[in-house]
């Protein structure tokens, strides 16, 4: 985490805590000639545009005072989107009981992608229900976990 994203995290966390929102991620990157500061937030039941606007306005005020970025940039506050990977313990807790896609580094049960109901994630493994059977996948073999999108 860069100095800028650490400072932004310090500034945004009290705002999010006040409203019961979760910080998912902070990105600061250059795209073309412009710099973007992106703050991804969530809450149980999902984040709304009004929630994003509220956080954006309050964070913008704090950023103007502290001024951790010495050049112009665009501030974007948004939901993480349905296709983002589950990363934090809070992500896994929030999505317990939902169907996830697990992408693996090495084949497990002859597959590199396993879809199943999320039961639990701990320090050593991810536990799923697949075809009514409990399977335990070692954490070190997991490349990425995302919510399964059903059409």
Swiss-Prot record:
GO biological process: ribosomal small subunit assembly; translation
Taxonomic superkingdom: Bacteria
Pfam families recorded: DUF150_C (PF17384), RimP_N (PF02576)
Gene Ontology terms: cellular component: cytosol
Cytoplasm among keywords: yes
The keyword Cytoplasm is annotated on this UniProt entry: yes
InterPro entries reported for this sequence: Ribosome_maturation_RimP, RimP_C, RimP_C_sf, RimP_N, RimP_N_sf
Entry keywords, A to Z: Cytoplasm, Ribosome biogenesis
Chief place where the protein resides: cytoplasm
Annotated localization: Cytoplasm
Role: Required for maturation of 30S ribosomal subunits.
Family listed: Belongs to the RimP family.
HAMAP family, alphabetized: RimP (MF_01077)
The protein's name: Ribosome maturation factor RimP
Gene: rimP
């Amino acid at each position: 985490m860069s100095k800028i994203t650490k400072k932004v995290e310090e500034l945004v966390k009290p705002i999010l805590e006040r409203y019961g929102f979760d910080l998912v991620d902070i990105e600061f990157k250059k795209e073309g000639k412009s710099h973007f500061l992106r703050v991804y937030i969530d809450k149980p039941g999902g984040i709304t545009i009004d929630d994003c606007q509220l956080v954006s306005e309050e964070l913008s005020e704090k950023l103007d005072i502290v001024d951790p970025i010495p050049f112009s940039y665009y501030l974007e506050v948004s939901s993480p989107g349905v296709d983002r990977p589950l990363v934090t313990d809070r992500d896994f807790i929030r999505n317990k009981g939902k169907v996830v896609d697990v992408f693996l580094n090495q084949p497990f049960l002859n597959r590199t992608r396993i879809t199943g109901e999320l039961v639990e994630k701990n320090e050593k493994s991810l536990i799923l229900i697949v075809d009514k059977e409990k399977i335990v996948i070692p954490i070190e073999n997991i490349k990425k976990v995302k919510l399964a999108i059903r059409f």
